[in-house]
C-alpha cells in the first residue's frame, strides 16, 4: 500500500510539474524577449511591465513603479545595450486558472550571478510583469564579509537612499 501511495504521489507531482507545457513555453519566451529587449536597449522592454508594475533592483533604494523605472533607466537605454541578463535556469509556476504566473530565475549578469523572481498576469493573449525583484547571489561562505562591507559603507557614507 505504501508503494502504491508513493507511486501515485510521484505521478501526481510529475503531472502538476508538466501540467501546461505550452503555457510554460509561452512564459519563458515572453521573459526571454523581455531580457533581450534590455540587452538591445529596445523601448519595448517597458511595454512588458504593467503600468502598475513594480521593479526592485539590487540597491535597497531601488523600488520603482514602471514609469519611475523607465525614467531612471533612460540613460541606459540610449546605449546599444542597457544591460544583459543571460538566463541559466528558470522555474515557472501558475495559478489554477492560469491567470497569475510566477517564476524564479538564475541569471548571469554584468554583476555576476544574480537571482530574480517575478509575478506576471495574463493580459488577453499575452502577459505583463507586475512585480520583478533582482538580487545579487552572495555565496554563504562570503556572506559575513559582504555584510561587513555594507555595514562599513553605511557607517562611513551613510545610506542616502530611502524606500520609495
Give a label for each model feature.
Residues 109-144:
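A contiguous, mid-protein "functional segment" used to position or interact
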Residues 20-23, 70-113:
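Surface-exposed, charged secondary-structure patches
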Residues 22-41, 154-157:
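Short, aromatic-enriched amphipathic alpha-helices that serve as compact interaction elements
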Residues 9-18:
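Hydrophobic h-region of N-terminal signal peptides that target proteins for export
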Residues 131-164:
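Low-complexity, intrinsically disordered terminal/linker segments enriched in charged
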Residues 1-4:
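Positively charged n-region of N-terminal signal peptides that target proteins for export
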Residues 52-64, 75-82:
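A short gly/proline-enriched turn/hairpin at secondary-structure junctions
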Residues 40-57:
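Short, well-ordered alpha-helical segments enriched in acidic and aromatic residues
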Amino acid at each position: 500500500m505504501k508503494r502504491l501511495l508513493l507511486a501515485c504521489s510521484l505521478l501526481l507531482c510529475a503531472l502538476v510539474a508538466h501540467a501546461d507545457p505550452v503555457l510554460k513555453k509561452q512564459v519563458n519566451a515572453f521573459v526571454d524577449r523581455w531580457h533581450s529587449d534590455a540587452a538591445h536597449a529596445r523601448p519595448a522592454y517597458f511595454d512588458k511591465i504593467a503600468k502598475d508594475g513594480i521593479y526592485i533592483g539590487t540597491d535597497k533604494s531601488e523600488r520603482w513603479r514602471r514609469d519611475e523605472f523607465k525614467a531612471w533607466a533612460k540613460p541606459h537605454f540610449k546605449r546599444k545595450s542597457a544591460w544583459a541578463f543571460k538566463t541559466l535556469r528558470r522555474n515557472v509556476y501558475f495559478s489554477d486558472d492560469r491567470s497569475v504566473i510566477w517564476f524564479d530565475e538564475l541569471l548571469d549578469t554584468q554583476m555576476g550571478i544574480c537571482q530574480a523572481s517575478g509575478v506576471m498576469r495574463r493580459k488577453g493573449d499575452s502577459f505583463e510583469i507586475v512585480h520583478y525583484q533582482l538580487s545579487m547571489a552572495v555565496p554563504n561562505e562570503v556572506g559575513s564579509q559582504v555584510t561587513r562591507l555594507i555595514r562599513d559603507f553605511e557607517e562611513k557614507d551613510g545610506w542616502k537612499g530611502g524606500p520609495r
